[in-house]
Amino acid sequence: MISELEPFYERVLARPGIVLLLGGIDAGKTTVAVELLRRGLANGHSVALVDADVAQSTVGPPTTVGLRCPGPDELTRESLRVADELSFAGTITPRGHLLPLVAATSTLVAAALARGCDLVVVDTTSFVSGLYGQLLKYHKLQLTRPDYVLAFERGGELEPLVGIARRFTSAEVVEHNVRTDLPARTVEERMIFREEQFAAYFAAGVSRWKVKPSVFMPTLPPEFDLALLDGIVVGMEDGRGSCAGIGVLEYDDAQNVLRMVSPVTHGVRGLRLGSVRIATDGKSRGPVDFRNLFRTD
């Protein structure tokens, strides 16, 4: 893989900019992203990884888009896990959540540029098929304005997206053929990996404190049943457009109060409700449908 991409690497290093990676499940996007970072650092560039894969996160916990601006000794999985900035998308699937995912991604690309990074690699989700896959990637392309698009092509699945990138952006679009005989992780394996990521995040140590019903976005209606929020993942917003981390809401039936469970203990001004429920051991408790939760259209 590396040798086939050598000409691409050379062009990027000669004229660094924003590189957006497109590809399906287990196509090798993250491996190439880290290689780009490594080569960029070796050539004296200031590099950044914007990890927009909210389900199989490399930077930060699932449900977030993460920004990492690593140094030469910070390219291990463990080092990349620690985000320099987070933006809360609130979901582990792009379907039905295109706006928060696109907004979070573009916010962190802008943050990377503001930090002075001249090589920014954007790793995206494997949601590449169908109408909504095209809409998601189109709007990401429009808002991130990449200089390069690297498409990990496997069996023609990216042909519509490659066409969109070539017609609607000024980016250099490169297709990289991925072997079709390589086994991909199963749905169960991907779920286990995600649950392990959640568990590791909360294993770092958590605090519990009471939460006022007035701090949420969306705003809770009068007489809202707080028990309905039990287990929901929330983004802990700092009031300056960034996310300090995530937490899980815990409802105390005996006292009729909500508590926040999170390793984050300060710098939080508001809580954004996510669209997934989990236990603090990382186990999934299912999705959240806002229309049913708020009984509205």
Whereabouts are the PLM-identified features?
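Phosphate/Mg2+-binding loops and adjacent switch elements
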Residues: A111-T169
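Nucleotide-state-sensitive switch-loop elements of NTP-binding domains
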Residues: I2-L22, A48-V121, V128
